[in-house]
């Protein structure tokens, strides 16, 4: 995680489309690329193991 709140806000205050994976601004209601309304906040913790 980031060391200070400004950086954390800059990195994680984004929404990710669950259909195409595009990043969208925080207040978006639908995806800028495909128009899908299913947006999730960007994950704060890594999911994969990387192997």
Curated annotation (Swiss-Prot):
InterPro entries attached to this UniProt entry: Ribosomal_eL40_arc, Ribosomal_eL40_dom, Ribosomal_eL40_sf, Ribosomal_zn-bd
GO BP field: translation
GO molecular function: metal ion binding; structural constituent of ribosome
Cofactor binding, per record: Bind 1 Zn(2+) per subunit.
Alphabetical keyword list: Metal-binding, Ribonucleoprotein, Ribosomal protein, Zinc
Keyword DNA repair: no
Superkingdom: Archaea
Binding site for Zn(2+): 17, 20, 31, 34
Cofactor(s) needed for function: Zn(2+)
GO-annotated cellular components: ribonucleoprotein complex; ribosome
Family stated for the protein in its record: Belongs to the eukaryotic ribosomal protein eL40 family.
Subunit (UniProt): Part of the 50S ribosomal subunit.
This protein's name: Large ribosomal subunit protein eL40
Source organism of the structure: Thermococcus kodakarensis (strain ATCC BAA-918 / JCM 12380 / KOD1)
């Amino acid at each position: 995680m980031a060391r200070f709140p400004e950086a954390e806000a800059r990195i994680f205050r984004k929404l990710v489309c669950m259909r195409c994976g595009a990043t969208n601004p925080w207040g978006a209601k639908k995806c800028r690329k495909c128009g899908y309304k299913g947006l999730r906040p960007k994950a704060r913790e890594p999911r994969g193991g990387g192997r």
